[in-house]
């Protein structure tokens, strides 16, 4: 169900530097809101954080309104998440206590069309983000692209487009393995496309 700690919703679990597990989670009933489930016993039990809500908009609220489907990484400064929103941009929130509490989300400046994202941190600290960089709520889910950050997510640059054809290419998942990015995403909601990119 949607209540209580459950583990991840869409995006992958992150093992933190203290050995605990952090699972990104969200609810899409009414106001969209996200939270994290944290486990200190290898997933036997989970503790849910407080909801992470967007600040109130200056104008009329879009429907739906809020943030869902966080994607996580950890570095020396703390634990961080990018959030899917209905605001035309990905939002970012940060934690200084290993995911127990989170800052109020703020725009990352990365255009997003209210479509799923995923990211991974390489061993050298570089972040790779797969997303639809289209700044319109419910906008076209093409292209699907790969962005890169070398400064902990403060700035992002376009690395490559995975697909630019018209259509729907969304819900990416990204892993790092043996010097390669392993990426999947939907293809027209009919099948799954897979990429292996050696870096």
Regions found by a protein language model. Name each.
Residues 1-199:
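Asp-box/BNR beta-propeller blade signature and adjacent active/binding-site loops
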């Amino acid at each position: 169900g949607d209540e209580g700690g459950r583990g991840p919703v869409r995006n992958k679990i992150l093992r933190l530097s203290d050995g605990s597990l952090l699972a990104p989670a969200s609810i899409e009933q009414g106001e969209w809101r996200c939270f994290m489930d944290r486990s200190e016993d290898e997933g036997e039990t989970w503790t849910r954080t407080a909801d992470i809500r967007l600040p109130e908009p200056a104008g009329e609220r879009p429907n739906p309104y809020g943030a869902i489907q966080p994607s996580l990484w950890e570095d020396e400064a703390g634990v961080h998440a990018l959030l899917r929103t209905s605001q035309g941009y990905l939002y970012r929130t940060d934690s200084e206590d290993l995911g127990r509490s989170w800052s109020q989300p703020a725009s990352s400046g990365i255009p997003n069309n209210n479509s799923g994202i995923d990211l991974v941190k390489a061993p050298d600290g570089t972040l790779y983000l797969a997303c639809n960089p289209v700044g319109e709520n419910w906008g076209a889910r093409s292209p699907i692209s790969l962005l890169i950050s070398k400064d902990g997510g403060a700035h992002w640059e376009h690395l490559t487009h995975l697909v630019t054809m018209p259509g729907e290419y969304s819900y990416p998942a990204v892993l790092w393995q043996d010097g390669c990015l392993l990426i999947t995403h939907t293809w027209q909601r009919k099948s799954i496309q897979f990429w292996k990119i050696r870096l």
